[in-house]
From Swiss-Prot:
Glycans are attached at N397, N439. The gene is CONALPHA. This is Conglutin alpha 1. Belongs to the 11S seed storage protein (globulins) family. Residues 1-19 form the signal peptide. Residues 306-315 have a biased composition (Basic residues). One of its GO terms (molecular function) is nutrient reservoir activity.
């Protein structure tokens, strides 16, 4: 019987994994643009210790890409209350440091405080919880659908986090309006106004319970029995005694949780080695903290881990590194900021770093990836296109001139993109970027866990790969001109400024 149950569970799990490898397709003509626009947040919800800004998910560009965006600012000692969403999230830390946690149902609480004696009362109950991790500027944090997430700023610098929600991922069985299900508090839903505009009165009723969190609508008696607590605690659970504003609250005396040592600033390969050491330490923590009694529970835990293996064959391939990770031991963050080793680097033009599921396996489950780029003033990212993904680009610093061209050869965007603005670059649309500032940088969220780009100019371009005669006849050039077109640009992706504009080199 147990074997049959395990087989059925694995079948259901892998069926779900295969299903989530595909994204819902946009409706007909939803991705046909005569013009793209630089987008800015159009709604802001203030909290006691921060602010959450949102972009309208009903905007045509975001609907085409099937995503929603928000920007969260958390002040010193600010705690973002635990919540989960109806779609996977990819979070980029633009600024600041702190700690965060994800709560995976069924995983053990492997972090526990030392047992203490209370005077005259014997041992005090230990606090145990699931793992807590540090984050820093440049980190990508992956949050699967329906997994509760919280974060806390324990530094002086405000934390700024950019979140992409993949609303067309098939893990989302609702509509394309993102929903944040808070576990506590009494706060406004950040995307509620878009639900009301899109869905009318029916949607207003959906968000209209009096407490504002997922427990608020239950009867007091239900919660008393479920948690085995008194009526006063139930009132707090439902948010009735909580007059703190919003979903980010101030922890005046600082948050006391069991967490690993604070990350030390590192550079380049040292930082990557530190992350590898942290990953091994996380695995060791799980082994050390696993109870050695109750054999039946231990077997049940191991069975649970086996059932929850993450094998998302997004591209119908064998596991790429021969390893399988369980939900309970997954690596949840990966740094792609300035301090990491770039994938492409030109000392006079800039650097690029791409994060895919090959580096960060949980992205296979989410079906997402990310790219960080910094381009020096007057340097160019050659014309290219995203082969198999939409790209949602957010400007972190500075400004740059963007040109985006559709399949008919029309420039659907030709203008400046500034700090804090977003541009959606649809799949296969050609794009070129020229930096207007020395500190221009961006993060781009990609809707494929192994995104590919194809250059249209330069050393690795499609045109360079064509036979000379094909280039000559396709572009109506003589052979010498065709040879120049193929070979004159010796750079792969990032082209330095013209010689007259190059920065002086000591």
């Amino acid at each position: 019987m147990a074997n049959k149950l395990l087989a059925l569970s694995l079948f259901l799990l892998f069926s779900g994994c295969f299903a989530s490898t595909f994204r819902q397709q946009p409706q007909q003509n939803e991705c046909q643009f005569q013009r793209l626009n630089a987008l800015e947040p159009d709604n802001s919800v203030k909290s006691e210790a921060g602010t959450i800004e949102t972009w309208n998910p009903n905007n045509d560009q975001l609907r085409c890409a099937g995503v929603a965006l928000s920007r969260c600012t958390i002040q010193r000692n600010g705690l973002r209350r635990p919540f989960y969403t109806n779609a996977p999230q990819e979070i980029y830390i633009q600024q600041g440091r702190g700690i965060f946690g994800l709560i995976f149902p069924g995983c053990r609480e492997t972090y526990e405080e030392p047992q203490e004696q209370e005077q005259g009362q014997g041992p005090r109950p230990q606090d145990r919880h699931q793992k807590v991790e540090h984050f820093r500027e440049g980190d990508i944090i992956a949050v699967p659908t329906g997994v509760p997430f919280w974060m806390y700023n324990n530094e002086q610098t405000p934390v700024i986090a950019i979140t992409l929600i993949d609303t067309t991922n098939l893990d989302n069985q609702l509509d394309q309006i993102p929903r944040r299900f808070y576990l506590s508090g009494n706060q406004e839903q950040e995307f509620l106004q878009y639900q009301q505009k899109e869905g009318g009165q029916g949607q207003q009723q959906e968000g209209g319970n009096e407490g504002g969190n997922v427990l608020s609508g239950f009867n007091d008696e239900f919660l008393e029995e479920a948690f085995s607590v008194d009526r006063e605690i139930v009132r707090n659970i439902k948010g009735k005694n909580d007059d703190r504003e919003g979903s980010i609250v101030e922890v005046k005396e600082g948050l006391k949780v069991i967490s690993p040592p604070t990350l030390r600033p590192r550079q380049g390969r040292e930082e990557e080695e530190e992350e590898e050491e942290e990953e091994e330490e996380r695995r060791g923590d799980r082994r050390r903290h696993r109870p050695h009694h109750h054999e039946e529970e231990e077997e049940e835990e191991e069975w649970s881990h086996q059932v929850r293996r993450v094998r998302r064959p997004h591209h119908h391939r064998e596991d790429r590194n021969g390893l399988e990770e369980t939900l309970c031991t997954l690596k949840l963050r990966h740094n792609i900021g300035q301090s990491t080793s770039p994938d492409a680097y030109n000392p006079q033009a800039g650097r690029l770093k791409t994060l895919t599921s090959l580096d960060f396996p949980i992205l296979r489950w989410l079906g997402l990836a990310a790219e960080h780029g910094s381009i020096y003033k007057n340097a160019m990212f050659v014309p290219y296109y995203n082969v198999n993904a939409n790209s949602i680009l957010y400007v972190l610093n500075g400004s740059a001139w963007f040109q985006v061209v559709d399949c008919s050869g029309n420039a659907v965007f030709n203008g400046e993109l500034n700090e804090g603005q977003v541009l959606t670059i649809p799949q296969n649309y050609a794009v070129a970027i020229k930096s207007l500032d020395d500190n221009f940088s961006y993060v781009a969220f990609k809707t494929n866990d192994i995104p590919q780009i194809a250059a249209l100019a330069g050393l690795t371009s499609s045109i360079r790969a064509l036979p000379l005669d094909v280039v000559a006849h396709a572009f109506n050039l003589d052979r010498d001109q065709a040879r120049q077109l193929k070979n004159n640009n010796p750079y792969k992706f990032l082209v330095p400024p013209p010689q007259s504009q190059l920065r002086a080199v000591a």
